[in-house]
Regions:
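A generic alpha-helix structural signal
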Residues: 79, 92-100, 162
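Acidic, glycine-rich loop-and-beta core segments that form the ion-binding/anion-interacting portion
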Residues: 122-163
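Short capping/connector residues at structural and topological boundaries
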Residues: 28, 51-56, 64, 138, ...
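Phosphate-binding site of ATP-dependent enzymes
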Residues: 4-54, 95, 99-102, 107-132
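Conserved active-site and cofactor/substrate-binding residues in soluble primary-metabolism enzymes
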Residues: 70-73, 87-98, 106, 111, ...
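Cap/lid and interdomain-hinge subdomains that line or gate substrate/regulatory clefts
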Residues: 47-88
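Noncatalytic linker/hinge segments flanking ATPase motor cores
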Residues: 10, 55, 65-72, 151-160
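Single conserved hydrophobic/aromatic residue that forms the stacking wall/gate
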Residues: 1-9, 161-171
Length: 171
């Protein structure tokens, strides 16, 4: 849709490097509170809507106070709720912190990682992701227009978008 920008990159990694541990994680705006939140689950690699319908108790959220941003204790809480310990716990706290910093830094509307994998050597990797940029913030990021892939957009989208319209934005 309007303002969504996608860039794809395919990376092949040997399957034996991974344990069977997959997680779901996303950063998005909680429209009911007007605050960003991290939504996460131990049920990665699955359709998150199906998980929400059948086992909602397996989906957690962590709301971010815009005055102070994501705090270290929140990253640790997420790693704890995912059942991690030791090196994997530390790696997940770094991953969550970096994920939120990236989301916040590019004016994203959504960062969704599904699955997030814990490897057999306790590394945390984003395997598949979806990033949606906030269309209202594109005027601050003129360089994002080059990343736009119209093949990824919904052809039935009724909203008109042209680069001229974005250039004429007077906000």
């Amino acid at each position: 849709g309007l303002g969504d920008v996608y860039k794809r990159q395919i990376i092949f990694l040997p399957v034996e490097r991974f344990s069977n541990t997959e997680y779901y994680m996303s950063v998005l705006l909680n429209r009911s509170t007007g605050r960003n939140m991290i939504m996460y689950s131990t049920e990665g690699g699955m359709d998150i809507e199906e998980v929400a319908d059948k086992t909602p108790h397996l989906i957690f959220t962590e709301e971010i106070d815009p005055k102070v941003g994501l705090q270290g204790f929140q990253c640790r809480k997420i790693a704890f709720n995912l059942g991690l310990s030791g090196t994997a716990f530390k790696e997940m706290t770094k991953f969550v912190s970096a994920l939120y910093a990236a989301y916040d830094g590019i004016d994203a509307a959504l960062f969704e990682i599904n699955p997030v994998l814990k490897t057999s050597d306790d590394k945390i990797l984003a395997v598949d992701s979806k990033v949606a940029l906030d269309g209202n913030a594109l005027f601050r990021h003129k360089d994002y227009a080059a990343l736009r892939d119209k093949r990824e957009e919904d052809p039935t989208d009724c909203l008109l978008y042209t680069s001229d319209a974005a250039d004429d934005d007077t906000r």
